Amino acid sequence: MCGKILLILFFIMTLSACQVNHIRDVKGGTVAPSSSSRLTGLKLSKRSKDPL
């Protein structure tokens, strides 16, 4: 029983890793934005006047 659970967990982790690699290869992005992630194709601009 314990062996089956470990095998299922290993299978799930492998599929998750493959999905992450596929997203990075195909879309050139990251799965979850973080401080080390680079944003591409996004331009952020400041407002010229503060509402306060």
Curated annotation (Swiss-Prot):
Protein name: Lysis protein for colicin N
One Gene Ontology cellular component annotation held by this UniProt entry: cell outer membrane
Superkingdom of this protein's organism: Bacteria
Coiled coil: none
Signal sequence region: 1-17
Pfam family, one: Lysis_col
Lipid moiety-binding residues (S-diacylglycerol cysteine): 18
Chain residues carrying a lipid of type N-palmitoyl cysteine: 18
Topology in the lipid bilayer: Lipid-anchor
Subcellular location: Cell outer membrane
Gene Ontology biological process terms from the UniProt entry: cytolysis
InterPro entries: Lysis_col (IPR003059)
Keywords assigned: Cell outer membrane, Lipoprotein, Membrane, Palmitate, Plasmid, Signal
Primary location recorded for the protein, binned into one broad class: membrane
Lineage: Bacteria, Pseudomonadati, Pseudomonadota, Gammaproteobacteria, Enterobacterales
Keyword Lipoprotein: yes
Task performed by this protein: Lysis proteins are required for both colicin release and partial cell lysis.
